[in-house]
């Protein structure tokens, strides 16, 4: 299980290592930890309510993710051990293929992860 592939929906907040949204170009420095988690929980609930498929997840990642991968439905491509931040990689590894994680915190912010490989 060395190679993985995931989509993600990232919400940055004031504590993110680079608090700037790649989707909007705006600062996220005024977004609190609590509001970022609460917003991500709403997306988690909406994705599950709509049917947690890769297509549904990609739609929401395109709509809201603060990562530049929003343009590709949150797709990060194939990666191996050590290619991503440890917390994110662990979140991906602990998520079954074709399913979504719970909320994962990394230095970049809060993520939902949909593992595709």
List where the protein language model places each region.
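Proteostasis/folding factors centered on peptidyl-prolyl cis-trans isomerases
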Residues: 1-30, 84-117
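Peptidyl-prolyl cis-trans isomerase
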Residues: 38, 42-86
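Short amphipathic alpha-helical segments, especially helix-boundary/capping motifs
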Residues: 16-18, 34-35, 65-66
